[in-house]
């Protein structure tokens, strides 16, 4: 299953690159929720942050994602969080986040996906970016934070 997932991501990326005509400068794979057979680690809610390994830590629809390099910290099992983590369940987010709040916080980011059916994916449903950034310094070196220009979420 893990090999299939790797190949599937590569094919999706290849399709997008071919259709857009973009030039690939560099690339890396950053997977989460998997069994690292080589290190004998089950990474649930985590991604590989081995020494020198590039990884992505998604924040939310508004704030983007962290591009980082692993420090290989054994105290963290050479791992890092695979995302910001929820502060609200999908149900709670749909009950507590208004569409007006969601639209307001997403100003400046083009998206046709800021709608009622994606309230559970709003930035309010996730931990604040600053909280994540301040807590991962022992396991990764942050290279950059990429900000979304366009954000798309599938609806139902």
Locate each region found by the language model.
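Domain-length cofactor-binding catalytic modules of enzymes
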Residues: 1-156
